[in-house]
Swiss-Prot record:
Transcription regulator component of the regulatory network controlling carbon source utilization through ubiquitination and deubiquitination involving creA, creB, creC, creD and acrB. Represses the transcription of the alcR, alcA and aldA genes by binding to a GC-rich region in their promoter. Also plays a role in response to carbon starvation and the control of extracellular proteases activity. GO terms for molecular function: RNA polymerase II cis-regulatory region sequence-specific DNA binding; zinc ion binding. One of its GO terms (biological process) is carbon catabolite repression of transcription from RNA polymerase II promoter by glucose. Keywords: DNA-binding, Metal-binding, Nucleus, Repeat, Repressor, Transcription, Transcription regulation, Ubl conjugation, Zinc, Zinc-finger. Belongs to the creA/MIG C2H2-type zinc-finger protein family. One of its GO terms (cellular component) is nucleus. The gene is creA. This is DNA-binding protein creA. It comes from Aspergillus oryzae (strain ATCC 42149 / RIB 40). Interacts with creB. Its main location: nucleus. Residues 35-52, 292-306, 406-422 have a biased composition (Low complexity). SMART domains: ZnF_C2H2 (SM00355). Disulfide bonds: none annotated.
Amino acid sequence: MPPPASSVDFTNLLNPQNNETGSAPSTPVDSSKAPSTPSSTQSNSTMASSVSLLPPLMKGARPATEEARQDLPRPYKCPLCDRAFHRLEHQTRHIRTHTGEKPHACQFPGCTKRFSRSDELTRHSRIHNNPNSRRSNKAHLAAAAAAAAAGQENAMVNVTNAGSLMPPPTKPMTRSAPVSQVGSPDVSPPHSFSNYAGHMRSNLGPYARNTERASSGMDINLLATAASQVERDEQHFGFHAGPRNHHLFASRHHTGRGLPSLSAYAISHSMSRSHSHEDEDGYTHRVKRSRPNSPNSTAPSSPTFSHDSLSPTPDHTPLATPAHSPRLRPLGSSELHLPSIRHLSLHHTPALAPMEPQPEGPNYYSPSQSHGPTISDIMSRPDGTQRKLPVPQVPKVAVQDMLNPSAGFSSVSSSTNNSVAGNDLAERF
């Protein structure tokens, strides 16, 4: 039975290589069966020719071009393996598979991916360019986190590099740092000033400053600028200017050799006070250039007193206690002797002798005998209205005196005119 006639011959379509052999016997069969239809024979031949052309069209003529390319020379050979390529780009792309080089980096901010081929980078960039995909959202979050971490790491590296490569501070940074230290070196604590003098004698190069930063608890930059300012001031004023400015630096040189003694302290104070009028201009112009917010410029310069000051402090500080100074010493329970208000005067207090150190001994107050009227005198008065006993007044007796009657009633008041009733009570007991 002959195959049914159709518009497409599926046998020829599946087996294109048998087109010539299959069409030969079928043609006489068709012609013998239908000799009266020449048009059908013509259509079958046309259909067979069209079917024979289908396989090259479906395959895109690729096998022919590949066979032709295989014949072309391959001058670009891989140095790491036995493969060869027609073009230089193909060889370069292949070598990157051996070396792991990825020169194509993603330019999206925060994305750190790199690729060895440009087409891979193009395909990856679509993830960032398409905002609707879930992968894009996840990639954005990951990229943002990576960018933040990279930014913090870069900031830490920059701060570290800046700290290690920082040049030494310039001189005009703190011009007035050592003003108060030079103005009042006698009242500064010895430990802080000795540290200041030690750093002033040390080498102030940038490397020495880095080594001293770990061992010193003070601000090394402030000390370095202070030392440089002092050296500049020494060069500016100089010791050759005469003895006028000598006391500015005398105490500092005492501190360099050791702590100043009390005599040196008194001498420096007397020198500074005797030359206060002469050096007033030198101090004022140095204080004027001090910044208002400088932490070192707030300390008062103690040696700059003037002669016409209203302070009762004498010009020369003596080694002994001054005459008008109160006797400052700890008072015991029975040593508080205050004069009564009747014995206080408005005149100037007389000068006391200089107090010498003496051992403290028991200093008890013994009340003097009263010379008031006795009971017989009161009873012998002619007027009856005056024959009355005075109103008894309870004396102010300390609690310890009450507990220790052997010590006597040492009253808190040192008045010599005690009340009659107080003495009577003391005599009764």
